[in-house]
């Protein structure tokens, strides 16, 4: 019976036509609809040709509730919505003019000393620490602070921004500074999420939520203008990434031995795999970032040893990381926009040694920090519950 049906011309034509229709449906994007049915994230569409101002909707944010008589309202706030109603999507990112410190402070009146913020009318669903390695890039830092504070406030997170300064004139070590930042941030609070953030990358879409994925490390800078808004290669883990403290410790943090530019991102991606975890990413249309243009940094030249180190990662990752981290904490300062941590992390043992200590490179770095301290709001009565004023000095 079936054989006779298949031999009929009309039946064969119907089968061939059905196959062609299915193929056309999939080629025109139907696969995305099918994927959504099975729980895969659908690629959202955004119009980046009409971005919103980075400070959009902040005027809609209510202040803390007040009871009759002017006293603070009782505690017991509801949780913030899973998706903040304040989000606008694509935001305008401009590199000129570089905002002054006074302007950034004025535009962010709800930010507390140390760069802390939490929503006034709802309980945040995530507490996120933003950790930024830094040296001698004050213009970049101001641009980041100007754009990042309103970006995070619209997401209704509780957050704190930590800027980790490498003291001395030795070779820059981004990954080791991030290890220092994680350790110092976790002394302050039990953060839910750690965002490791390059100072020269500015997010362009506030739907790119600064929260962690409990299933594994998350790489969020998936579409930078530097790379034509696409991922440069599949295992890329550079720019901006997010891990829970448990995920960070499971992979032994980041490597300490990468002095200079290059290599540490690939080492970190390898650590994720060796620790039995998988990298997740937001959709390309969401993870947009603009990179601030800059010349090559003195003291951050290309690392000639990076390939030798990468070959050893499989054997070295359990010995080189948070469990081998040594540094000297030189200062911890609560400025109006961020917590500034200055650390002596030593020098590259393979290269020419330079003085390491509280000696800052030429430029405005020290003046910038002094200005931050001078503009710090007056102390409030009682201790700050989330800031560590008595961090010990010495080796860690």
UniProtKB/Swiss-Prot annotation:
GO cellular component, one term: Golgi cisterna membrane
GO biological process: carbohydrate metabolic process; galactosylceramide biosynthetic process; glycosylation; protein glycosylation
Key words, A-Z: Disulfide bond, Glycoprotein, Glycosyltransferase, Golgi apparatus, Lipid metabolism, Manganese, Membrane, Metal-binding, Signal-anchor, Transferase, Transmembrane, Transmembrane helix
Residues involved in N-acetyl-D-glucosamine binding: 263-266, 306
Side of membrane Lumenal, spans: 32-396
Protein function: Responsible for the synthesis of complex-type N-linked oligosaccharides in many glycoproteins as well as the carbohydrate moieties of glycolipids.
Protein name (database record): Beta-1,4-galactosyltransferase 3
Higher taxonomy: Eukaryota, Metazoa, Chordata, Craniata, Vertebrata
């Amino acid at each position: 019976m079936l054989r006779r049906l298949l031999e009929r011309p009309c039946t064969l034509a119907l089968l061939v036509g059905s196959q062609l229709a299915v193929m056309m449906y999939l080629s025109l994007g139907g696969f995305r609809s099918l994927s959504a049915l099975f729980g895969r994230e659908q690629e959202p569409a955004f119009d980046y040709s009409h971005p919103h101002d980075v400070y959009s909707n902040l005027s809609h944010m209510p202040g803390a509730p007040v009871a009759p008589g002017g006293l603070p309202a009782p505690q017991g706030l509801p949780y913030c919505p899973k998706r903040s109603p304040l989000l606008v999507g694509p935001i305008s990112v401009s590199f000129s003019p570089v905002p002054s410190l006074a302007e950034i402070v004025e535009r962010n009146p709800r930010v507390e000393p140390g760069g802390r913020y939490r929503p006034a009318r709802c309980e945040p669903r995530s507490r996120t620490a933003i950790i930024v390695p830094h040296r001698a890039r004050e213009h970049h830092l101001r641009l980041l602070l100007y754009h990042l504070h309103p970006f995070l406030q619209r997401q209704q997170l509780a957050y704190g921004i930590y800027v980790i300064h490498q003291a001395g004139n030795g070779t820059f070590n981004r990954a080791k500074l991030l290890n220092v930042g994680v350790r110092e941030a976790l002394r302050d609070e039990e953060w839910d999420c750690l965002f490791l953030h390059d100072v020269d990358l500015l997010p362009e879409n506030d739907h790119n939520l600064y929260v962690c994925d409990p299933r594994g490390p998350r790489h969020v800078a998936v579409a930078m203008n530097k790379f034509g808004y696409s991922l440069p290669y599949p295992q890329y883990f550079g720019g901006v990434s997010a891990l829970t403290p448990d995920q960070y410790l499971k992979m032994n943090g980041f490597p300490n031995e990468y002095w200079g530019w290059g290599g540490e991102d690939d080492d970190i991606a390898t650590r994720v795999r060796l620790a039995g975890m998988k990298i997740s990413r937001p959709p390309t249309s969401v993870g947009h970032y603009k990179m601030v243009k800059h010349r090559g940094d003195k003291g951050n030249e290309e690392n000639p040893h990076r390939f030798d180190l990468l070959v050893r990662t499989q054997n070295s990752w359990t010995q080189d990381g948070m469990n081998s981290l040594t540094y000297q904490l030189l200062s911890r300062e609560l400025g109006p926009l961020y917590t500034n941590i200055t650390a002596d992390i030593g020098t590259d043992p393979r290269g020419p040694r330079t003085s390491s200590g509280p000696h800052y490179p030429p430029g405005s770095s020290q003046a910038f920090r002094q200005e931050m301290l001078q503009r710090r709001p007056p102390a409030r009565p009682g201790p700050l519950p989330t800031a560590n004023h008595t961090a010990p000095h010495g080796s860690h």
